[in-house]
Amino acid sequence: RTVIHAVKGAGFAVYEGQSVAIMGSNGSGKSTILAAIAGLLPVTNGQIYAAYEPRLMGVGAALLPKVSGLRNVRIGCLALGMSSEQIDELLDSIIEFADIGEAINRPLRSYSSGMKARLLFAIATSIRPKILMIDEALSVGDKEFRAKSESRIQEMLASAGTLLMVSHNMAEIRRLCNRGIWLEEGVILADGPLDKVIDTYTKGK
């Protein structure tokens, strides 16, 4: 059996109020790092410490395809630890933010990737997370939704929230992040101010 080490000694610390872009080639270990921080993948070596529960939002996040968007909102909120009373209070604002119209009552399997992204983001940020991790999820939304999502992320960062983001969209990264980490084959090649890391990454690709 071949053992593949997706991430190799990639140690770093992220502080409140920081917004970090993790960039690198496909298969470099970016998504693996986010999944490990979220507790979705076991860590075979080293430790992960977080002051708050990290919330991961990705295009492959678990939603139930056979039930309605509305039902998925309730299930997603329960998974985030909300009470039924909290869900009832937030339900209208989540539906309004997702802005998918009557589709909220249709089975999720009928949704486009953009509609799923809208619903996921609305659920994930309904209670402002202190640590939000985004794995390419904003890239599938339309321009209007991305602008609305970025505005909510900026609000979160302004209140000392923390963002870790995987994206190949450099314009999006520049708008949202102030620090960059370049990862290749599970190894950190650069870590520092965003513009400097983007420059190093672009030249080294």
Regions found by a protein language model. Name each.
Residues T125-I134:
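A short, proline-enriched helix->beta-strand linker immediately N-terminal to the Walker B motif
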Residues R146-S159:
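Helical segment within the ABC ATPase nucleotide-binding domain
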Residues S167-H168:
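H-loop/switch region of ABC-family ATPase nucleotide-binding domains
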Residues L176-P193, Y201:
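H-loop (His-switch) and adjacent beta-strand-loop-beta switch element
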